[in-house]
Amino acid sequence: MVYLDSSSLLKLLWPERESEALRSHVATEEAVIVSSLAELESEVQLKAAWLAGRYRGSRWRQFRTKLAEFRDTDPFRFQSLPGAVFQTALRQHRAERRTHCRTLDRLHLAAMEELNVSRLITHDANQAEAARAMGFEVLMPGVQVTP
């Protein structure tokens, strides 16, 4: 089981350099958790890109349809988050020896804890660093990691 954050979820919707490697990796997983946070954040990013003129309304609707189709596609498992995720995020933030990360990234890490998932697929380097500092396994399909 692995948690898919919005940076990676978006790469499954529109083509980017890492998209093919990500698709191939996702196909090998038994369960890919998509939280309500990742779904919301992805929807917001899709709409923002449309409103900024990156693509037409018809393409935006196609992206939203594809995202909705993931709900009925293996290996995706869409999960709602409990309200406790905010307290978990605050506790993580306040903990000593943790790497700083942005609020939404912190909420993804709290979601992982709340959903009892220890593996993360992300394409966000800052979030990856914070996740590793917390002991999570981080996967970044298609990204060359330099030692």
Ranges and model annotations:
Residues 39, 68-97, 105:
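Acidic catalytic patch
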Residues 1, 109, 113-147:
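Acidic, PIN/NYN-like endoribonuclease modules and their adjacent C-terminal/linker elements
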Residues 5, 105, 124:
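Acidic active-site catalytic centers that drive phospho-/nucleotidyl reactions
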Residues 17-20, 24, 70-78, 128-133:
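Noncatalytic, solvent-exposed loop/strand surfaces
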Residues 29-32, 75-77, 114-120:
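Short active-site oxyanion
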Residues 8-9, 38, 85, 108, ...:
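Alpha-helix capping/helix-boundary segments
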Residues 1-40, 45, 49-62, 134-136, ...:
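Short, well-structured N-terminal submotif of metal-dependent ribonuclease cores
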